[in-house]
Amino acid sequence: MATPPKRSCPSPAASSEGTRIKKISIEGNIAAGKSTFVNILKQVCEDWEVVPEPVARWCNVQSTQDEFEELTTSQKSGGNVLQMMYEKPERWSFTFQSYACLSRIRAQLAALNGKLKDAEKPVLFFERSVYSDRYIFASNLYESDCMNETEWTIYQDWHDWMNNQFGQSLELDGIIYLRATPEKCLNRIYLRGRNEEQGIPLEYLEKLHYKHESWLLHRTLKTNFDYLQEVPILTLDVNEDFKDKHDSLIEKVKDFLSTL
C-alpha cells in the first residue's frame, strides 16, 4: 500500500504559547511496536516529527536514513555495545545504559533545533524517553544484579546532572503507552530478527512489563521528577497487529493531542 503524502495538520487544541513544540514520548516494552508506530505517525502530518531510538549508535552502525544521526568517536572506535550488554550484562550494563541515555539526549535535543522550529503546530514524538532509560531499563538491570551498588549510584548521579542541564528542554507534554503482553513482545522479537535480541528470555520481558505497568498504567512507580505524576497518558492495546489499523490509531492520537 502506497504511503500517502504528508498533509497540513492543524492542531485541534489552540495554544497560547504559539509554536512551542509539544513533546510526546512513545513508551512500551521491547518489540511492543514502537518503531512501527512512530513510522506511522511521521507520515501523517508535516507538523509532526519523530525521534527514533538511536539503535544504530548502540550497534555501531551508521544509519544514513536518520537525519539525527552522525558518526561519533565512540562509533569509530568500534564495538556493538547493545550486543555486549546482552552477552555479558554484569560487565556492560552500566556502560550501555549510560551511552543509551547520552545518545538519546543528543538526538532529542538536535530534533528540537530542527525543522519543527518553523512549524505552525509542532509535535515531536520521542521513541522512549530519558525517564524510561532510568526507571525501567537501568533500574531493572540494577535489581537483577547486573549493576553493582556503586555503578547504580553513579548512574543516578549522572542522570540527575544531565537532566539538570538539559531536562527542561525535554520535559514531556504527554506519553503514549503501547501496551502488549510479554509473550507477544517475545514473538515480535523473533519476527524482526535483530541479532542482538535473539537471546532475550521471557522473564526479562516480564520484568520490564511489570515496570511499565507500574509507571504508566497504575502510576505507582516513584521517580525524582514530580511533574511526571501529572503528565497525561494515552494507553493503546497493541497486542494485535496494527499495521492495518492506521486510521483508528491516528484518530486516537489526534484526540489525545487535543487535550494537551
Swiss-Prot record:
The modification Phosphothreonine is found at T72. Substrate binds at E53, Y86, Q97, R128, D133, E197. InterPro entries: DCK/DGK, Deoxyribonucleoside_kinase, DNK_dom, P-loop_NTPase. It holds the Pfam family dNK. One of its GO terms (molecular function) is deoxyguanosine kinase activity. Phosphorylated and activated in vitro upon phosphorylation at Ser-74 by CSNK1D/CK1. Keywords: ATP-binding, Kinase, Nucleotide-binding, Nucleus, Phosphoprotein, Transferase. It is found in: Nucleus. Its EC number is 2.7.1.74, 2.7.1.76, 2.7.1.113. The modification Phosphoserine is found at S11, S15, S74. Gene3D superfamilies: P-loop containing nucleotide triphosphate hydrolases. GO terms for biological process: dAMP salvage; pyrimidine nucleotide metabolic process. Phosphorylates the deoxyribonucleosides deoxycytidine, deoxyguanosine and deoxyadenosine. Belongs to the DCK/DGK family. This is Deoxycytidine kinase.
